[in-house]
């Protein structure tokens, strides 16, 4: 479905799928847990899922003759780290709005992890004291205008690269890649677990797996804490992406599966259960997840497995999207592991 779209390679290639035997055993052994390691996909600033999206956006940025990538995220945004990395790789400037999305007061929160790496790569990173919202923000529009006012030519990339016209394509490619890997493995996964906030990762998966008639097996774990807004944005991106790739049919509402039980107490704030999930993944598989995104999807997968959501014998694929650098912003929380 993606043949007509130009792709600028930023990743190593197909990401590894690995079986997680010790986590499987810790969860009772009746459901096989596997992981697709999007967190290990590139040498660019520790990689992550945003690079898969940006591969389909960069050709448009280059064609526009822009000299500055402009994007937005929270203080510990993985996305803005990846935009900064791409700008450095392409020899472009980068201006970033880092909003105060998370009610978290660790003393080093705005000086370590993602934002430290972002600044190290030369991005002009500006902290704005606005709260969490996945929609289009005035602060981002102001940043775009500021580049124009200074004589630059901006290329605008929204939060998470999600509502960009090509934002869903990378994870259509993910679904096609999984199908090829399943052919090599000799089986198909029964469920795919993915974190969802700004929406295009799950939306792209839904469209890609809809072409394989199994979109409803993509289980989104909401980490936004604003489930109605997130679902609406996923729906928007699904429809746009399905039209772009000429899926040939509308995606049904029941094919968009998002569970809202794990985002508490707030976006970017881990619950005790999130922390327990982070520790279990680390101590059984040395797989590092973060308290904002992957810790919550890990929590969701663990809880669903324990309460019998997945039938006995199921093979579950956990999409590890990255995000470990944010752990540095929670140094007090994890000071003892």
From Swiss-Prot:
Catalysed reactions, semicolon-separated: 1-aminocyclopropane-1-carboxylate + H2O = 2-oxobutanoate + NH4(+)
SUPFAM superfamilies xrefs: Tryptophan synthase beta subunit-like PLP-dependent enzymes
Xref: InterPro entries: ACCD_DCysDesulf (IPR027278), ACP_carboxylate_deaminase (IPR005965), ACP_carboxylate_deaminase_bac (IPR020601), TrpB-like_PALP (IPR001926), TrpB-like_PALP_sf (IPR036052)
Active-site residues, Swiss-Prot/TrEMBL: 77
GO biological process: 1-aminocyclopropane-1-carboxylate metabolic process; amine catabolic process
Listed Gene3D superfamilies: 3.40.50.1100
Modified residues (N6-(pyridoxal phosphate)lysine): 50
Keyword Heme in annotation: no
Cofactor: pyridoxal 5'-phosphate
Record keywords: Hydrolase, Pyridoxal phosphate
GO molecular function term, any single one: pyridoxal phosphate binding
Pfam families assigned to the protein according to its UniProt record, in alphabetical order: PALP (PF00291)
Assembly information from the UniProt record: Homotrimer.
Chain's role: Catalyzes a cyclopropane ring-opening reaction, the irreversible conversion of 1-aminocyclopropane-1-carboxylate (ACC) to ammonia and alpha-ketobutyrate. Allows growth on ACC as a nitrogen source.
NCBIfam families: ACC_deam
PANTHER family for this protein: 1-AMINOCYCLOPROPANE-1-CARBOXYLATE DEAMINASE-RELATED
Similarity annotation: Belongs to the ACC deaminase/D-cysteine desulfhydrase family.
Name this protein carries in UniProt: 1-aminocyclopropane-1-carboxylate deaminase
Organism of this sequence: Rhizobium radiobacter
